[in-house]
UniProtKB/Swiss-Prot annotation:
EC number: 7.1.2.2
Keyword Translocase set for record: yes
Coiled coil: none
Any GO MF annotation of the entry: ADP binding
Domain of life: Bacteria
UniProt keyword annotations, A-Z: ATP synthesis, ATP-binding, Cell inner membrane, Cell membrane, CF(1), Hydrogen ion transport, Ion transport, Membrane, Nucleotide-binding, Translocase, Transport
Binding sites annotated in the UniProt record for ATP: 169-176
Classification via InterPro entries: ATP_synth_asu-like_sf, ATP_synth_asu_C, ATP_synth_asu_C_sf, ATP_synth_F1_a_nt-bd_dom, ATP_synth_F1_asu, ATPase_a/bsu_AS, ATPase_F1/V1/A1_a/bsu_N, ATPase_F1/V1/A1_a/bsu_N_sf
Gene3D superfamilies: 2.40.30.20, ATP synthase alpha/beta chain, C-terminal domain (1.20.150.20), P-loop containing nucleotide triphosphate hydrolases (3.40.50.300)
Bilayer topology term: Peripheral membrane protein
Residues of the site described as Required for activity: 372
Protein name, per record: ATP synthase subunit alpha
Pfam family, one: ATP-synt_ab
Length: 511
């Protein structure tokens, strides 16, 4: 074997040329104290607020308090294996999560890691969880309907795409059920060959501080009814640390913004923001920030407003996408004047108020029609629904007033009696079993029958049966009528005449 000096020198030259002198520099600090999910860290002098750090055991955290001599870090995970003196490394990044269609059908934690056992995510894009909401110029006023499939809501408290509608009530009044039915109601638009991309609404459910069994049940219902394929579940359950419960809504919102910014439509339900506020209060108190009313920190209003402002309807230059938010707030004994409920009511564009006593009377969904409002929804109602539901709100208000009065007197004149009868039947008509959302055109026909006196002769107990029979008849024998309402989005004179004929015949058969 002969050694050629020229070859050796060539190899050496190549190696010297490829030698990389770059050194990897990372700023490292040390843990001074740790406990209750908060670490005090010394030595990270150049860290920025909200920046991610990594502890020596691989757990991540976020710097929230920047003080003169130390940094307060909240820990995204267990603090059990973190000891005083451990090293902490700056990551130079803000909290971000995976986004995009690859997340549809999956259950992830607050940092976007899959927790459903279906393997790793195939998402390529990532987004920061806490970004600025769209300004005034890119927005457009709410004008497209966001159907929930619930008669009581779509007729009286309509929701539009890009709106923020609060769902508020005590525990066990059916708040999550409203979100669930709204998700299920988007199914027909996602079926093969149904409509165009503009009709599809992608759903995101953020569970904050819920029991794991509750979240599992929610996922199971979506899966059984074929609604999981267009939904994303973000879960920060009761057993997760407070920072995870605090960041989960922001993470879910970032996932929804992906659809909004790509000209698609998304709907996000935060269930519920009271628990996020409690988690934020816990973090703030442990970081020794000064407490305010009900011991919440002073910026808890800003926490919720910056989250809910990210729901928007964008104008055509920005792709016409939308993100609709349905935040949930749990009240204690119907106290709407507590700190968090008043905050969120003032931020949102209306509220759906659910009441325990209505729920126990069997009026479900237990919507209190008098206290519930939708500040922008009427602009998003189709003309057909406006035509039939215009009078129903007034009639129900009069009915409630009279019913309170009628408890005292027995001799009522004919007009009062008529009003009470009509009100009782309309209230019965607005009841709806769970998991059975109705298409808008079917709701229109049913309410048309109620407002035009077709129920007045029936016993209250027969109203439900009348409605079911009418819908079955229309679906089988008169689908053209339903299609006409769906396409024209209004009740033309021609459709009205045909409807009256159908209703007259059906009423005779029914009686």
């Amino acid at each position: 074997m002969d050694i050629r000096p020229s070859e050796i020198s060539k190899i050496l030259k190549e190696q010297i040329r490829d030698f990389d002198q770059k050194a990897e520099v990372s700023e490292i600090g040390w843990v001074l104290s740790v406990g209750d999910g908060i670490a005090r860290v010394y030595g990270l002098d150049n860290i920025q607020a909200g920046e991610m750090v990594s502890f020596s055991n691989g757990v991540h955290g976020m710097a929230l308090n920047l003080e003169i001599d130390n940094v307060g870090v909240v820990i995204f995970g267990s603090d059990r294996d973190i000891r005083e003196g451990d090293s902490v490394k700056r990551l130079g990044a803000i909290v971000d999560v995976p986004v995009g269609p690859a997340l549809l059908g999956r259950v992830v934690d607050a940092l976007g890691n899959p927790i459903d056992g279906k393997g790793p995510l195939k998402a390529t894009e990532r987004r920061r969880v806490d970004v600025k909401a769209p300004g005034i110029i890119p927005r457009q006023s709410v004008h497209e309907p966001m159907p929930t499939g619930l008669k009581a809501i779509d007729a009286l408290i309509p929701i539009g795409r890009g709106q923020r509608e609060l769902v508020i009530g005590d525990r066990q009044t059916g708040k999550t059920a409203i979100l669930l039915d709204t998700f299920l109601n988007q199914k027909p638009f996602h079926e093969k060959g149904a409509g165009n991309e503009q009709d599809k609404v992608y759903c995101i459910y953020v569970a904050i501080g819920q029991k794991r069994s509750t979240v599992a049940q929610f996922v199971k219902v979506l899966e059984e009814r074929g609604a999981l394929e267009y939904s994303i579940i973000v879960a920060a359950t009761a057993s997760d640390p407070a920072p995870m419960q605090f960041i989960a809504p922001l993470a879910g919102c970032a996932m929804g913004e992906y659809f909004r910014d790509n000209g698609q439509h998304a709907l996000i339900g935060y269930d519920d923001l009271s628990k996020q506020a409690v988690a934020y209060r816990q973090m703030s108190l442990l970081l020794r920030r000064p407490p305010g009313r009900e011991a919440y920190p002073g910026d808890v209003f800003y926490l919720h407003s910056r989250l809910l402002e990210r729901a928007a309807k964008l104008n055509a230059e920005n792709g016409s996408g939308s993100l609709t938010a349905l935040p949930v707030i749990e009240t204690q004994a119907n106290d709407v004047s507590a700190y968090i409920p008043t905050n969120v009511i003032s931020i949102t564009d209306g509220q759906i108020f659910l009441e325990t006593n209505l729920f126990y009377q069997g009026i479900r969904p237990a919507v209190n029609v008098g206290l519930s409002v939708s500040r922008v929804g009427s602009a998003a109602q189709i003309k057909a629904m406006k035509q039939v539901a215009g009078s129903i709100k007034g009639e129900l208000a009069q009915y409630r007033e009279m019913a309170a009065f009628a408890q005292f007197g027995s001799d009522l004149d004919a007009s009062t009696q008529r009003l009470l009868n009509r009100g009782a039947r309309l209230t019965e008509l607005l009841k709806q079993p769970q998991f059975s959302p109705l298409k808008t055109e079917e709701q229109v026909v049913v309410i048309f029958a109620g407002v035009n006196g077709y129920l007045d002769a029936l016993a209250v107990s027969d109203v439900g049966r009348f409605e079911q029979g009418l819908l079955t008849l229309l679906r089988s024998d008169h689908p053209d009528l339903l299609q006409a309402i769906a396409h024209q989005k209004q009740i033309t004179d021609d459709v009205k005449d045909k409807l009256i004929v159908v209703l007259n015949t059906y009423a005779k058969i029914f009686s």
